[in-house]
Amino acid sequence: MEMKKIACGVLFAAASMTAVMAAEEVGAPAPGPASAASAALPALGSLVGASLVSLFSYYLH
């Protein structure tokens, strides 16, 4: 069971690093948001990220 937790942690870390390394850099700045609806998008992303981390920690516990 302990090896399963370690393997899951390593796999999660590798997937996170792969996602970060795959991000392409954009030379030109992005245009500003056209409406206030896009302002809530970062809050939604952090909520999803917190939920995934919570689920991952619950799985390892």
From Swiss-Prot:
Its main location: membrane. Residues 36-61 form a propeptide. Coiled coil: none annotated. Glycans are attached at residues 29, 31, 33. A lipid is attached at residue 35 (GPI-anchor amidated serine). It comes from the Eukaryota. Residues 1-22 form the signal peptide. It comes from Arabidopsis thaliana (Mouse-ear cress). This is Arabinogalactan protein 23. The gene is AGP23. Proteoglycan that seems to be implicated in diverse developmental roles such as differentiation, cell-cell recognition, embryogenesis and programmed cell death. PANTHER family: ARABINOGALACTAN PROTEIN 23, POLLEN-SPECIFIC ARABINOGALACTA PROTEIN BAN102.
